[in-house]
Amino acid sequence: MAIKKFSSLLLPLLMVLALVVLPIISGRTQEHPCQDYRLGCKSRDVCNAKCLSLGYVKGGDCVTFAFPICCCKINFGFQDDSPISSPIFTD
């Protein structure tokens, strides 16, 4: 009897857990969208210059996960000129 009651509560509990945990996990991966990275980040200026020289228009930044890395920011230039993301509407 107790096993049936436990198993009937287990599925809804797992579903609620999945609904709570999945957005947290997916949100954490988008905090620092790196396209390219180099191990060891000594300064932001050096990292930014390195990423700009590699062709990343938005440059780069030092990010620490388990150790500091130089994270080159993803180029989403086409989204900057999108009329949906622009707060100014012109006719």
Swiss-Prot record:
Keywords: Antimicrobial, Disulfide bond, Fungicide, Plant defense, Secreted, Signal. Disulfide bonds join 34-72, 41-62, 47-70, 51-71. Coiled coil: none annotated. GO terms for biological process: defense response to fungus; killing of cells of another organism. Its main location: secreted. It is found in: Secreted. Residues 1-27 form the signal peptide. One of its GO terms (cellular component) is extracellular region. Belongs to the DEFL family. This is Defensin-like protein 82. The lineage of its organism: Eukaryota, Viridiplantae, Streptophyta, Embryophyta, Tracheophyta.
